[in-house]
């Protein structure tokens, strides 16, 4: 669970994530969740921050273990769920260090070795389940899919006002480069700016808990945007409900399964090979 407030930047290791989720929390600040399939060349991960209720369910879509440092009161309701393989550094679930070059609570870092050790100690598999079905279906060809009828998209603003995040398309390499807080977003580990092949906007109803904290229900169905190769087009998404929690002052619907993405004609969305950012 990546910190994304200015005091916690730059992040370390995030450029090696295959999928990055970005969601808004209190005060308009966003948090990032990196999903890693291969972490062999990752030497540092951080800074790590606290969990919000929707992130463990997004991690479950990828059959992934979810690592965080603390949590909101609403997220605490789900952290004991055996279907959600969560690890809380604040409870000693994995080893970490507090770096001296940043102030607390923006200075918690760890390594992939620490995370794998934590999984082994809890007897959590580091391999995908045999019946795992990935949420995203990637193009089998390395040649990107062209969409002649899609709208041109060179600069893409996320709508997150706090960090003023946006992406700019580079026609030379076909990637979208990430900016926030008025400057390029850089991985401390590599020194390189974050860049992705695909961006998906998943539009969900924005509600609030009783104390004003954001409430996002990720089940049901809705619309979104798929952005790749300099174009943007409308898509649809859907996610099945597996349960309802009534302890949070609302009927909180949740699901462990994957989000399904389709084109506007309801055929399955095929995304280009490469890293993907989901907002």
What are these regions (language model features)?
Residues 2-21, 26-279:
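A surface/extracellular/periplasmic glyco- and lipid-processing/surface-interacting theme
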């Amino acid at each position: 669970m990546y910190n994304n407030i200015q005091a916690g930047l730059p992040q370390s290791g995030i450029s090696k994530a295959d999928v990055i989720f970005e969601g808004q929390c209190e005060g308009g600040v966003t948090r990032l969740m990196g999903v890693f399939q291969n972490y062999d060349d990752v030497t540092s991960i951080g800074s790590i921050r606290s969990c919000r209720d929707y992130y463990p369910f997004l991690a479950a879509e990828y059959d992934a273990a979810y690592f965080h440092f603390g949590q909101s009161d609403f997220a605490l309701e789900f952290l004991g769920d055996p279907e959600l393989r969560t690890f809380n550094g604040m409870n000693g679930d994995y080893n970490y260090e507090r770096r001296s070059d940043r102030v607390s609570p923006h200075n918690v870092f760890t390594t992939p070795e620490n995370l794998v050790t934590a999984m082994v100690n809890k007897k959590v598999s580091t391999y995908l389940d045999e019946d795992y079905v990935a949420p995203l279906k990637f193009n089998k060809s390395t040649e990107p899919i062209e969409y002649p009828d899609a709208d041109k998209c060179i600069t893409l603003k996320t709508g997150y006002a706090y960090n003023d995040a946006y992406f700019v398309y580079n026609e030379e390499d076909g990637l979208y480069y990430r900016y926030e807080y008025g400057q390029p977003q850089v991985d401390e580990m590599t020194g390189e700016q974050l860049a992705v092949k695909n961006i998906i906007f998943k539009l969900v109803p924005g509600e609030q808990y009783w104390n004003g904290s954001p409430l996002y229900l990720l089940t049901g169905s809705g619309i979104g945007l798929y952005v790749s190769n300099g174009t943007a087009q409308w898509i649809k998404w859907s996610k099945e409900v597996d349960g309802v929690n009534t302890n949070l002052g609302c009927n909180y619907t949740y699901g462990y399964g994957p989000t399904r993405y389709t084109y506007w004609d309801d055929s399955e969305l095929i995304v280009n090979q490469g890293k993907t950012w989901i907002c």
